[in-house]
């Protein structure tokens, strides 16, 4: 529901509140016969600011300087210190980490085959820089969901937006899945799960197999969302091996890294190409010998040799794929882009691949539909751009409230809604209850 201006609760200690939020909290305390704790002393307050904002304690010199400023004007000293800490690079590192937890940031794929993501760091740095640049939250969301589809003014903008979509490329993956269709559906499911929990505070993925048991999210809505992500190609960059069948390429980024260690001379390129050709020839001969041995009923002793040669071939190919035709190191990253033609999704009964039901159009969650929600998505693109615009619309209050609640949790140890990624019926109601319809849980300009 859209927040609305509500009348503030009456309180007895009218001089204590400094904001609307204080009025709600004080009213709840007074209802229980309690009074607020006294204000913190200068040293305690300074330590809280440092730990909360940059994750480091103040030095003795900083304690002393703050004490001098505090004695002159406590309010001015406090506000100046907040501004100073927000401007430090450690602020982005501290608070970017909180978002990275929500975005399930890790540098490997997890699950049965734990392959590394050597380029995940670009997304990590993007998040840190976004916090340090005080990027508006709606822009932050749009870039991560559909950065590759946003308008740009420079190659640098294009690169940043591509890296932002690493939000969708990270996460656990069943890289040993034999069925490519099943892998695509599982990948889309994981992307739906992280997007809806991180941004909307809703658990949508259980609607893959049945209508949501607690929230008004039918299976048709789940597959409408799934179609958007099935129409999206994900680049996460793991290699293909015998135990990892679903590796992909990485995105070629427009701004080259100035890293001489990643470049190759023409002589080195020729050497690697020659070694690659030799390894591919040996691998082909070994595989042919293994097939002939099996056909003749003999023992096949070549499996370990074949695996070693495959790893060698993969390594040489990766080395060549990391440079352009001139040997200059490419700038690579994780992220997503649209497939040429979108997928029109089909509902799968109980989520089972061999039990297709009706086709549904790509779309959004109807329970959150608002004025301006698109009736039909474009036939020539995935619909992620429209999804990003829908998520960040001024008519959609949920993303801002979810983010405000996450900030509250990190500052006070517990969110106003304690189930920070579940604002649904199975989550916890806001406390105090008056916050449910209040506009106090919004992000200001």
Where are these regions (language model features)?
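Structured secondary-structure scaffolds
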Residues: 374, 378-379, 386-399, 403, ...
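Short, charge/polar-rich alpha-helical segments
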Residues: 251-280
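Heptad-repeat amphipathic alpha-helical coiled-coil interaction surface used
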Residues: 269, 273-276, 280-283, 290, ...
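Amphipathic alpha-helix face/heptad-repeat signature
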Residues: 191, 195-198, 275, 309-312
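Short, structured secondary-structure elements
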Residues: 1-252, 337-357, 361-366, 399-437
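Charged, low-complexity interaction regions
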Residues: 288-302
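Long amphipathic alpha-helical scaffold segments
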Residues: 301-344
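N-terminal low-complexity segments that are often proline-rich with Ser/Thr-Pro
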Residues: 438-445
């Amino acid at each position: 529901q859209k927040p609305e201006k509500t009348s503030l609760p009456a309180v007895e200690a009218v001089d204590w509140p400094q904001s609307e939020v204080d009025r709600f909290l004080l009213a709840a305390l007074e209802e229980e016969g309690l009074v607020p704790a006294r204000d913190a002393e200068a040293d305690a307050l300074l330590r809280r600011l440092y730990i909360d904002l940059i994750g480091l304690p103040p030095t003795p010199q900083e304690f002393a300087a703050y004490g001098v400023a505090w004695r002159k004007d406590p309010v001015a000293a406090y506000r100046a210190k907040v501004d100073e800490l927000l401007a430090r690079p450690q602020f982005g590192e501290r608070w970017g980490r909180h978002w990275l937890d929500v975005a399930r940031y890790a540098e490997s794929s997890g699950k049965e085959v734990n392959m590394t993501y050597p380029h995940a760091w670009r997304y990590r740095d993007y998040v840190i820089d976004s916090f340090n640049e005080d990027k508006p939250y709606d822009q932050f969301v749009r870039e991560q969901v559909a950065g590759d589809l946003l308008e740009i003014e420079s190659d640098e903008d294009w690169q940043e937006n591509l890296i932002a979509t690493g939000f969708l490329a990270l996460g656990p993956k069943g890289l040993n899945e034999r069925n490519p269709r099943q892998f695509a559906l599982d990948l889309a499911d994981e992307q739906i799960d992280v997007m809806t929990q991180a941004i909307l505070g809703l658990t949508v993925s259980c609607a893959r197999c049945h209508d949501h048991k607690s929230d008004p999210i039918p299976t048709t809505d789940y597959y409408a969302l799934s179609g958007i992500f099935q129409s999206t190609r994900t680049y996460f960059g793991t290699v293909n091996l015998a135990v990892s069948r679903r590796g992909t390429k990485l995105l070629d980024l427009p701004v080259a890294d100035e890293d001489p260690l990643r470049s190759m001379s023409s002589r080195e390129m020729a050497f690697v190409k020659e070694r690659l050709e030799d390894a591919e020839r040996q691998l082909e001969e070994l595989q042919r010998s293994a097939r002939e041995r099996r056909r003749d009923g003999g023992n096949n002793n070549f499996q370990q040799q074949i695996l070693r040669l495959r790893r060698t071939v993969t390594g040489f190919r990766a080395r060549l794929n990391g440079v352009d035709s001139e040997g200059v190191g490419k700038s690579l990253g994780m992220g997503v882009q649209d497939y040429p033609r979108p997928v029109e999704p089909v509902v799968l009964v109980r989520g089972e691949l061999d039990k297709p039901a009706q086709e549904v159009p790509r779309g959004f969650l109807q329970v959150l539909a608002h004025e301006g929600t698109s009736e039909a998505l474009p036939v020539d693109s995935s619909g992620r751009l429209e999804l990003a615009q829908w998520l960040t619309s001024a008519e959609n209050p949920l993303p801002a409230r979810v983010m405000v609640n996450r900030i509250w949790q990190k500052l006070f140890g517990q969110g106003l809604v304690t189930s920070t990624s579940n604002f649904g019926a199975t989550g916890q109601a806001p406390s105090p209850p008056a916050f449910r319809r209040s506009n106090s849980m919004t992000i200001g300009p």
